Each structure stands twice: as structure tokens, then as C-alpha cells.
Regions:
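Sec-dependent bacterial lipoprotein signal peptides
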Residues: 1-18
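N-terminal leader/targeting segments and the immediate start of mature chains
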Residues: 17-65, 70-71, 102-106
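Extended lipid/amphipathic-ligand handling interfaces
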Residues: 62-66, 87, 174-179
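Membrane-embedded segments
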Residues: 78-83
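Short Lys/Arg-rich amphipathic alpha-helical segments
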Residues: 84-85, 100
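Acidic/charged, solvent-exposed loop-and-adjacent secondary-structure segments enriched in E/D, K/R, S/T
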Residues: 94-126
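Gly/Pro-enriched, hydrophobic low-complexity segments
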Residues: 134-208
Length: 208
């Protein structure tokens, strides 16, 4: 009986391992590419941004610049190039040098930070591969969230990503992929908080 139990455990682990490897292989076939910026040697990215939070609407310029040892410098510019926010991002954490209290409320700041986290780092912690109707779904763990990318069958680039954790959900939409400085990236990105409280639309102006 002990021998049979050991054999059963070995077979279970073997098949789980095979399934995991198969999922990992399938998740990269055809080789997928994810909408991230400044991960292939690019030094700067500039977006035109529009943010909606309740009845409040704001237009601004979002500037991202590479610094030392993987650090990213972040600036938000308003009218007449006035600096509205200044921060750095490294290893998944933000450090703010300048952030007026009335620029973002708590929900809007959370959506803004989650947007940048997903656009500045490649997804790594693979969780699941699934084919559903005409879509391929590939999920990764990202901090406390599960990020699920949606690909149309045969496509290399995703058109949508759903970020979820319990009742906290966001939708990312990637539209109009174009070649910028040798890298294929979405020209427009829309991020919407599931309860409709906050939405951010980014239009890529340059990637160098």
C-alpha cells in the first residue's frame, strides 16, 4: 500500500509538471509581446493623457525617463509646461518628490500607479493559459493582482488586459499598435476602473 501511495504521488507530480510546462510553452506560442515601455533600451516615453474622475476632467502630458539602475523618472506637466507631479519608480515602488494633495484622490492615484506599474515592467509570474472561443487568455500574478491578457487567435499583441483582486477590478484596452523606434506598441491605451469612478486615456507621442 505504501508503494502504491508513493507511485500515485510521483505520477501526480509528473503530470502536474507536464501540464505546467505545456501551459508555459503554449503561452509563448506564437511568441507573445506585451504592451510595456522602456524595457528594451528606450530612454524616454511621452504621452498625452486625459483623466476622468467623477465630474472632474484633466488633460496633461505624462513624461517618463530612464535614470540609474532601472529607475524611472515620472513627470506630469500641465498648461504652460507647469510641473504638476514629480516622482521616481523602481522595483515596483513609487517615491514622490512633488505631489499636490488636490491632484489625485485616493482611487485616482491608485489607478494611475497601477497603470504605470503595468506599462513599465514585463509580466513575469505566469499563472494560467486558456483558450476561450476566439480568444487566448494568458494570466500573470502581479503583486496582489491577477492580470489576464486577451489575445485574438493568432495575434502576437493583446487587445485587452483585465486586472482583478476580489471586488477591485480594472480594464486596460490597447489600441492601434504602431512601430515606435523599432518597437511595436499601442498608440492608445484606455484604463478604466470597474466601478466607473476613474478612467485614464493615454496617447503615445514619442518613444526614444
Amino acid at each position: 500500500m505504501k508503494y502504491l501511495s508513493t507511485l500515485f504521488l510521483f505520477c501526480t507530480l509528473f503530470f502536474v509538471g507536464c501540464a505546467t510546462n505545456t501551459n508555459l510553452e503554449r503561452s509563448q506560442e506564437p511568441l507573445r509581446s506585451y504592451p510595456v515601455f522602456m524595457t528594451d533600451g528606450q530612454q524616454s516615453a511621452v504621452f498625452k493623457a486625459e483623466a476622468l474622475a467623477g465630474n472632474y476632467k484633466a488633460n496633461f502630458i505624462l513624461m517618463l525617463n530612464a535614470a540609474y539602475e532601472g529607475e524611472k523618472q515620472i513627470k506630469i506637466l500641465g498648461d504652460y509646461a507647469a510641473v504638476l507631479m514629480k516622482a521616481t519608480f523602481k522595483d515596483g515602488a513609487f517615491t514622490y518628490q512633488y505631489l499636490p494633495q488636490d491632484l489625485f484622490d485616493k482611487v485616482a492615484l491608485s489607478v494611475f500607479e497601477d497603470t504605470l506599474k503595468n506599462l513599465l515592467a514585463e509580466p513575469k509570474d505566469f499563472k494560467k493559459y486558456k483558450v476561450k472561443q476566439d480568444n487566448t487568455l494568458i494570466s500573470f500574478k502581479s503583486g496582489k493582482f491577477l492580470n489576464t491578457y486577451y489575445f485574438k487567435q493568432g495575434d502576437k499583441y493583446p487587445y485587452q488586459m483585465k486586472q482583478s483582486k476580489g471586488l477591485i477590478n480594472k480594464d486596460f484596452y490597447f489600441d492601434d499598435y504602431r512601430l515606435f523606434n523599432g518597437k511595436q506598441v499601442p498608440y492608445r491605451i484606455l484604463v478604466s476602473e470597474a466601478k466607473g469612478r476613474v478612467a485614464i486615456e493615454l496617447t503615445l507621442l514619442s518613444l526614444k
